[in-house]
Regions:
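PRPP/pyrophosphate-binding module of the type I phosphoribosyltransferase fold
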Residues: 66, 93, 102-181
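Extended interfacial segments that mediate partner engagement and assembly in macromolecular machines
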Residues: 1-97, 117-118
Length: 181
């Protein structure tokens, strides 16, 4: 179980999301299972990873007030073709089914970006600039949203997605991830 932590970068440059909760460090077995699910097509691992994501729902920062819908961080269509599936959408779909909460796939990856894994914080922010947009016909005005991603490293992806959601009127954007680096 991870405890709340304070990030010096976030203190200097507050992110657009209201809070983020995660229960695991992305190393050892956790890192291995995430990588096998994402890159080796081991789709059956979604059960375990969805369970780990669900643990983050009990964090007081997440559970203190209800949310209207899960919002998966979207993959670009090129990545979906490469992997055969959208790993975050698969996890969120399973969580939504179990919890009877809706999924709003209201974000789309409008621009293909290089993998974030080798980039510094500054490079990650630049790489993601204008990479997401609200899907046409989507409305998040006044909604309390729970953004979902697999790994939190610098928070750049969550920040960019939350920025878009709040720019379109979301009341709050909290986030959960399977693990953090």
């Amino acid at each position: 179980m991870g405890a709340p932590f304070s990030c010096p970068d976030c203190e200097d440059h507050p992110p657009a999301f209201d809070c983020v909760a995660t229960r695991y460090q992305a190393n050892g077995l956790v890192r291995d299972l995430i990588h096998r699910f994402k890159y080796s097509g081991e789709f059956h691992l979604r059960q375990i990873l969805a369970n780990w994501l669900e643990e983050a729902l009990s964090d007081p920062r997440i559970s203190r007030e209800p949310f209207d819908a899960f919002v998966p961080v979207p993959l670009h269509t090129t990545r979906i073709r490469e992997r055969g599936y959208d790993q975050i959408a698969a996890l969120v779909e399973l969580m939504a089914k179990r919890s009877h909460r809706p999924v709003w796939a209201c974000l789309r990856r409008s621009r293909y970006t290089e993998s974030q894994t080798r980039f510094s914080r500054k490079e990650r922010l630049q790489n993601l600039r204008n990479a997401f947009e609200l899907r046409k016909g989507s409305s998040v005005l006044g909604k309390r949203l729970l953004l979902v991603d697999d790994v939190l490293t610098t928070g750049s992806t969550l920040d960019e997605c939350a920025r878009i959601l709040k720019a379109h009127g979301a009341k709050s954007v909290r986030a959960i991830t399977v693990a953090r680096r």
